[in-house]
């Protein structure tokens, strides 16, 4: 019997991952401040990722933490610091206090969002070039994860996820889509990899129009992507037109998060 804690379990990625990480003999301890109902093989906990006592209690007896909680996009510096950075500190520290040996952190391509197309494919351990406060928070927590590995021996895997949605929504996502099933494969690989140590890997499907980022580290963890956004290409291009290489959204990895402040989508 194993126990995996999932923070932010009521969110989009958490909701897609939960059924895909369910296994006989595995309990998913799903935690969120938003209402959620425990499914088969789950224990639901209503708590904030910023609550150290609640998080430490949730981590007791667990084998791994999948840390998804946080604001999933740009917001004020104060909110980003409180939830994305502060909440991530709580997640790692609670795991340490409870003796959890492994944390898998949902980082983002926005940690390196200002990487230009001329530098594609982006290496797994590319130096941070965050495109927003949100991207800064992801880069900061990658550094935090490295510290928890080097100081405490914790396995800490940071997944720079690109575009994880039920299906691609626009032309950019024909290159950056991470399908729900491939997300499940990626996180499962991270849960079962033998003594991974500290890793930074990108999360994306095997898209025909991909090649934007390295998949070497993800594959080294055992990830084998099977899905391809090209299955949706005709539908997307009919709605949005062919990709324009001069489109500012396509000039850097971070897409619309690299646009001027008043055009960046906010939460």
Task: Give residue ranges: language-model regions.
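N-terminal Rossmann NAD(P)H-binding glycine-rich loop of SDR-like oxidoreductase domains
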Residues: 4-24
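Conserved active-site helix of classical SDR/Rossmann-fold NAD(P)-dependent CH-OH oxidoreductases
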Residues: 19, 88-89, 139-146, 150, ...
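NAD(P)H-binding glycine-rich loop region in Rossmannoid oxidoreductase-like domains
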Residues: 37, 47-83
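Glycine-rich NAD(P)-binding loop of the Rossmann-fold in SDR/ketoreductase-type enzymes
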Residues: 50, 79-90, 98, 128, ...
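Catalytic helix-loop patch of NAD(P)-dependent Rossmann-fold dehydrogenases
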Residues: 82, 117-156
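Conserved Rossmann-fold NAD(P)-dependent oxidoreductase catalytic core, especially the SDR/UDP-sugar
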Residues: 90-129
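Alpha-helical substrate-binding/gating segment
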Residues: 161-167, 177-198, 206
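Conserved C-terminal active-site "lid" loop/helix of NAD(P)H-dependent oxidoreductases
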Residues: 199-201, 208-224, 236-265
């Amino acid at each position: 019997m194993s126990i995996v804690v999932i923070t932010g379990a009521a969110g989009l990625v958490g909701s897609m991952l939960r059924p895909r990480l369910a296994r006989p003999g595995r309990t998913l301890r799903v935690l969120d401040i938003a209402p959620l109902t425990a499914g088969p093989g789950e224990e639901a906990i209503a708590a904030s990722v910023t609550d150290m006592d609640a998080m430490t209690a949730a981590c007791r007896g667990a084998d791994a933490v999948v840390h998804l909680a946080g604001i999933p996009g740009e917001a004020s510096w104060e909110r980003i610091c409180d939830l994305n950075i502060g909440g991530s500190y709580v997640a790692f520290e609670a795991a340490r206090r409870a003796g959890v040996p492994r944390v898998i952190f949902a980082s983002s391509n926005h940690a390196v969002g200002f990487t230009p197309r001329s530098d594609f494919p982006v290496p797994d351990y590319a130096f941070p070039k965050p495109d927003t406060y949100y991207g800064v928070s992801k880069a900061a927590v990658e550094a935090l994860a490295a510290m928890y590995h080097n100081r405490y021996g914790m396995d800490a895997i940071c997944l720079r996820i690109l575009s994880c949605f039920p299906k691609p929504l626009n032309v950019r996502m024909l290159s950056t889509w991470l399908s729900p099933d491939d997300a499940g494969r990626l996180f499962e690989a991270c849960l079962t990899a033998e003594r991974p140590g500290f890793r930074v890997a990108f999360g994306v499907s095997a898209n025909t129009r991909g090649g934007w980022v390295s998949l070497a580290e993800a594959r080294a963890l055992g990830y084998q992507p099977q899905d391809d956004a090209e299955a949706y290409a005709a539908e997307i291009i009919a709605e949005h037109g062919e990709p324009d290489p001069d489109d500012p959204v396509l000039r850097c990895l971070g897409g619309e998060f690299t646009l001027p402040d008043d055009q960046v989508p906010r939460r």
